[in-house]
Amino acid sequence: MIHMLNAAAYRVKWTRSGAAKRAACLVAAAYALKTLYPILGRRLKQPGHRKAKAEDYPPAENRERLHCTEIICKKPAPGLNADFFKQLLELRKILFPKLVTTETGWLCLHSVALISRTFLSIYVAGLDGKIVKSIVEKKPRTFIIKLVKWLMIAVPATFVNSAIRYLECKLALAFRTRLVDHAYETYFANQTYYKVINMDGRLANPDQSLTEDIMMFSQSVAHLYSNLTKPILDVILTSYTLIRTATSRGASPIGPTLLAGLVVYATAKVLKACSPKFGTLVAEEAHRKGYLRYVHSRIIANVEEIAFYRGHKVEMKQLQKCYKALAYQMNLILSKRLWYIMIEQFLMKYVWSGCGLIMVAIPIITATGFADGDLEDGPKQAMVSDRTEAFTTARNLLASGADAIERIMSSYKEITELAGYTARVYNMFWVFDEVKRGIYKRTVTQEPENNSKSRGGLELPLSDTLAIKGTVIDVDHGILCENVPIITPAGEVVASSLNFKVEEGMHLLITGPNGCGKSSLFRILSGLWPVYEGVLYKPPPQHMFYIPQRPYMSLGSLRDQVIYPDSVDDMHEKGYTDRDLEHILHSVHLYHIVQREGGWDAVMDWKDVLSGGEKQRMGMARMFYHKPKYALLDECTSAVSIDVEGKIFQAAIGAGISLLSITHRPSLWKYHTHLLQFDGEGGWRFEQLDTAIRLTLSEEKQKLESQLAGIPKMQQRLNELCKILGEDSVLKTIQTAEDTS
């Protein structure tokens, strides 16, 4: 063995002791690799790297459960995989639509700040070494000069540190603005905001995706760029500086480099083996946050009904249940982070520090440029100060490099969390795009078979079971349905093959029992529901106006309520003035609210200020303002008095508006010319309306109902009299015979 060391030392010009130390390092490294590799290999193959089970965290509640028939697809859990990089590249096209953008400018400034901070760190490390050298050499003048330099360099260093954080926040805000703008454009295009909730079931909480998910994704991307770019640059530059310094002093950097590579590799393997599925956990946490917010908003939207029913206990239990599910998920993430961070800190703080001391000591001890065995006291003292300077500089550089590697490895957890946010944001844009193109899918939950613990969400593409084969054609005059069925988003056929035509000047009365498809027909005519079969000829949307039973009151002034959804500029472009709006309010008997509420510019919460009848008359005022060719009236005057209601309908007919009305009031029949009647079993009939005959039949129906209403009471009294008298009655005998048969 000694002969081998001597031969090796002679060949590479090493001393015998240096060759022995290098051989010892290589043997130790080989032994550590031989010992750790099988352990890590077994650890990676253990079932500990399983997918999260159902008992790990309870599944989030679904907003709706639909029947699943044939085609079912499973969503993969978000993680660091090919899907993540594909989704990130697709989102990059939104973040950077072209080369020269605001986001590119902030990114370049951020990169310059990160690079500047790296060079400042290297300069400060060298300056620290020179300060320590001046202390060892007892040179106060040199020490003061170096200290002043150190304080002066602190000014740009602190500015760069602050600028890095500032630019990171600006970059995150720019990303968020870009994503929000694109999301809003897509969300409000082609009535996607309606269809994504009522026609599609993949996004349970679009508000969560549009707000918090986009915010978290933007912050995570910007922070991760900062946490990866600077550390990678730090590792490259500090490694180059350390190797150059060691080589200039006559020391070999091979041993420390191999040791560093081995330690980093082993640490990465251990952390990867111990890392929980943060991407899946964070995505589930975001889902539960969104559902909790949805439950809160649901209570706010129905607060009056809940108060009337005194249902606060039920709603409180529902809220507590949702919050406990969220708290359970957050506690699960915290507990997994606790052990992961403990292992991470032990490896990166203590194991790396010990290895760092070895890596710094070996080049200094073995460097020929620091040998002082045969020197006098003066030169020996100089060598001591040089070694001190080199040790201080190398230690600072190594600490900077170790911190950079630590941040790179710690970023794995952040990357997995980013994968969760990326999956949710990408899925939101994907769903918006498909819904915009008329592709609808319903999310369903399949109960696990044989007590299976699978949590996978299942989806049924509705477009595969109900292909949209119908055609919608915009025409200038008339509404024509040719074999158009009424099919709900859940796939239920309410009415099949509607065939009718409404010309201008015709007024159609639509009747039928509840749930027969009256309002559903209006949704098809308005373009909210697709036409699955047949051909629908209808005017463009601007020539049709829908008025529901409960009109929507927007945020804004009284003027904004009348002209909704137009803006004030749109009103002026159409040639309207406030005096014209006053005439409209006179037509619907609503002008008194102008003085009562403080004029046209008064801003209030109009859904609470106006009564039910006033809100319905406001809806009719909007119809007179927009002057459509066709008005779709869905019980829109049920809270208005009959006399005022008749005047409004007469004014609408006088304005040349064709009415398609859903109403149960016989007093309005005289304002219609045709009848579309649904029977509630899928059948329908379309005919000309004879108001006189229909009113006569209605009066006869009401008379018979009133006469027959007393028969059960009379029959009961007859039975009582027969029992008291002990006699039978002919009617009682007939009834008994019927019951027996």
Curated annotation (Swiss-Prot):
Residues 479-705 form the ABC transporter domain. SMART domains: AAA (SM00382). Expressed in brain and testis. ATP-dependent transporter of the ATP-binding cassette (ABC) family involved in the transport of very long chain fatty acid (VLCFA)-CoA from the cytosol to the peroxisome lumen. Like ABCD1 seems to have fatty acyl-CoA thioesterase (ACOT) and ATPase activities, according to this model, VLCFA-CoA as free VLCFA is transpoted in an ATP-dependent manner into peroxisomes after the hydrolysis of VLCFA-CoA mediated by the ACOT activity of ABCD2. One of its GO terms (molecular function) is organophosphate ester transmembrane transporter activity. Changing residue 207 to H: Does not affect ABCD1 interaction. This is ATP-binding cassette sub-family D member 2. The chain crosses the membrane at residues 107-127, 144-164, 251-271, 351-371. Residues 1-218 are annotated as: Interaction with PEX19. Residues 107-399 form the ABC transmembrane type-1 domain. GO terms for biological process: alpha-linolenic acid metabolic process; fatty acid beta-oxidation; fatty acid derivative biosynthetic process; linoleic acid metabolic process; long-chain fatty acid biosynthetic process; long-chain fatty acid import into peroxisome; myelin maintenance; negative regulation of cytokine production involved in inflammatory response. Gene3D superfamilies: ABC transporter type 1, transmembrane domain, P-loop containing nucleotide triphosphate hydrolases. Keywords: ATP-binding, Glycoprotein, Hydrolase, Membrane, Nucleotide-binding, Peroxisome, Translocase, Transmembrane, Transmembrane helix, Transport. Belongs to the ABC transporter superfamily. ABCD family. Peroxisomal fatty acyl CoA transporter (TC 3.A.1.203) subfamily. It catalyses: a very long-chain fatty acyl-CoA + H2O = a very long-chain fatty acid + CoA + H(+); a very long-chain fatty acid(in) + ATP + H2O = a very long-chain fatty acid(out) + ADP + phosphate + H(+). It is a multi-pass membrane protein.
